[in-house]
């Protein structure tokens, strides 16, 4: 069973010089001009299989208890290495 979902969004805006800043001599009239554009897209493909452990091993390569042990080992190594 496989399903596929695709989503995309985009936004665009233009920023121009504020006339109050120019009239108060805070910035020069030709110094401010900017354009920004943002876009985002996401695709989700899901596949399920009950007989194969490989997808689980790819998604979660290290369990949390081994992650905690590795973090503690790194912290102890740092303390011993710096001589604290």
Curated annotation (Swiss-Prot):
* Protein name as it appears in the record: Uncharacterized endoplasmic reticulum membrane protein YMR122W-A
Compartments where located: Endoplasmic reticulum membrane
Query: What else is noted?
Result: Present with 49500 molecules/cell in log phase SD medium.
Low complexity compositional bias, start-end: 34-54
From which residue to which does the signal peptide run? Answer: none
Alphabetically list the UniProt keywords.
Endoplasmic reticulum, Glycoprotein, Membrane, Transmembrane, Transmembrane helix
Entry membrane topology = Single-pass membrane protein
An annotated GO cellular component of this protein is: endoplasmic reticulum
Attached carbohydrates are found at 45
The taxonomic lineage of its organism, from the top, reads: Eukaryota, Fungi, Dikarya, Ascomycota, Saccharomycotina
Which coarse location class applies to the principal site listed for this UniProt protein? endoplasmic reticulum
